[in-house]
Amino acid sequence: MRATPGRRSFLATCGLAAAAMARPLAAYGQAVDNARQASRPSQLQITDIKCAYVRGSLFVKIHTNQGIWGCGEGVDAVGGTYHLVQTLGNRIRGQNPLNVHRLFEQLRKGSIFGGAQAGMFVAVLTAVETALWDLAGKALNVPVYQLLGGKFRDKIRVYLDTALYQTRLPTPDQFAAAASKAVKDGYTAIKFDLDQAADPNKYDSFNWTASPAEVQRMVDQLSAARQAVGPNVDICADMHGRYDYPTALQVARRLEPLNLMWLEEPIPAENIDAYKLIADATSTPICAGENVYLAHGFRGLLEKGALDIIMPDLQKTGGLGEGQRIANLAHLYYVPFAPHMVASFLGAMASSHVCASVPNFLILEWQTY
């Protein structure tokens, strides 16, 4: 085809625009390459650590003497953790950030009497540890999964958390519609919340026992979702640890015909024996772990066979190295690893490196809200 003058000028304009856009991208890429080439790993030192609290997550950025930096995220770390981040930063300033396990153990062991076993401290430590892995990958010019020992897979399967947790009680039809939309969008697994705060059939806000009508509502909602998508889509249900043993057992048994992928946190995380009783009494797989911290926290659950699937949150349980330890511990008991994930895209990508690096990975949570 012969180009007309108008067509020539249009193509020329497009070419100039593309070149103009390519220049800054090329410059950025060159800057990254220069930083990597200039990296002297054995001489790296931590010079500063900064943090910000954005949309419910703590973000930590670690700086070095070579201009290389790393970012990490911690969830459920609360907004007033600035001073804790600075305290941890002061302890590792001047050290080589590539010694990730050593620095993690130094910070954890140095705060045993200050809450280093669980909760907010571990969530903050998680953000710091993840930032160290990010920094190490940049300094050595390799993906973090490579630093964790390499990958078992090239793709990470995710399920969609439908987030039907509203001020108004979702109907079974809304569950069905959400399930159908998720499948249409390409998901092969979906999750629904069953602990609906707006349910008028609750006994009261402090009662952990569900009323018969509340249990029936849960069954009706999930039955509608299953009917909408058929038998070949995985469906998960989350109770957020807000019920007691009798309710959990009743719900698990009532849901058996729906062939769920799992029932998540039907009771609070603390009582291992109660989880064992539920898991032994139903064919519905029982899953928990988002409120369990460090590999030590999962040891008892696995030793007693209290869970069918473990679900650590890699942005609060201790970080990527600790997450891999938890997965490998579960692998010894032939228990699948399905990480909880309510973090930002940064946390999601960090979790994906661990998911790639362990053999017993099942599926990762994905948020769209």
Question: Over which residues does each language-model region extend?
Answer:
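Proline-centered loop/turn at the N-terminus of a beta-strand
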Residues: P143, R157, D234, P285, ...
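C-terminal segment of N-terminal export signals and the immediately downstream linker at the start
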Residues: P24-G56, V60-I62, W69
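Conserved, mostly hydrophobic/aromatic
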Residues: G67, V128, N141, I190, ...
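N-terminal secretory signal peptides and thylakoid transit peptides that target proteins
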Residues: M1-A18
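Metal-dependent enolase-superfamily TIM-barrel catalytic cores that perform enediolate-based chemistry
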Residues: K155, L160-K276
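Metal- or metallocofactor-binding catalytic centers and their adjacent structured scaffolds
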Residues: N65, W69-L140
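Glycine-rich, aromatic-flanked loop segments that form ligand/cofactor-binding clefts
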Residues: E129-D161, Y165-T167, T188
